[in-house]
Regions:
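Gly/Pro/Ser/Thr-rich low-complexity, intrinsically disordered segments predominantly at protein N-termini
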Residues: 1-196
Length: 196
């Protein structure tokens, strides 16, 4: 007897939203596939929390920091994505079909993990960079003191990598952020975890 492999049907966005409302974990919607997001390590979670503190203290004007629960709709690619943090300036803009998603982040932050780094600095970055509102896309390593910032300047994307001893600026913030402040009491200067 031959076994038949049944592939799941592609979901539509309404299916995705229904699943998100009852799920205990977050999912992204990519090309009709509902993809579960992995939980973070101790370092990942502490770095994400530290970024919330550092960015929240530097908010200016109508700009505000949003944690990892904020969903984004990438209209040009029909995708629902999450980030580890973001800054939205002005009122959040919501697509008609999803009142919980926004479409206008100014800055998106991802804390890299081995399982997500390829996507975070690849297809996911490209998805977010397709948003007209996005001015910076930030990748924060969790295994070394390193921050990579993609910035849009006059319609073109450039990238700068910052290491221990450097500081970096982001649009919308009142002051620069020292890389060392992100990792304080989390990683030592060699990248060794201080949490173990």
């Amino acid at each position: 007897m031959q076994a038949t492999l049944r592939l799941p049907r592609r979901a539509n966005y309404a299916d995705y939203l229904a699943a998100e409302q009852t799920s205990e974990c977050r999912h992204e919607f990519i090309d009709g596939v509902i993809v579960a997001m992995a939980g973070g390590s101790d370092e990942h979670n502490r770095i994400t929390g530290r970024l919330a503190q550092l960015l929240g203290r530097r908010e200016t004007g109508s700009c505000g920091y949003y944690p990892s629960d904020q969903r984004f709709w990438i209209a040009s690619r029909a995708r629902g994505r999450y980030s580890d943090g973001s800054i939205i300036c002005g009122p959040p803009e919501h697509p008609a079909h999803d009142a919980q998603a926004t479409t206008n982040p100014t800055v998106v932050i991802e804390v890299l993990s081995p399982s997500s780094e390829g996507d975070d600095d690849g297809e996911k970055r490209s998805d977010f960079q397709s948003l007209a509102s996005l001015e910076a896309y930030v990748l924060v390593a969790q295994d070394q003191r390193r921050v990579k910032v993609y910035r849009r300047t006059e319609g073109e994307w450039g990238v700068t990598t910052y290491r221990d001893g450097d500081s970096f600026e982001l649009p919308t913030l009142s002051s620069s952020i020292p890389v060392a402040d992100i990792y304080e009491r989390i990683l030592d200067s060699t990248g060794k975890s201080l949490l173990r």
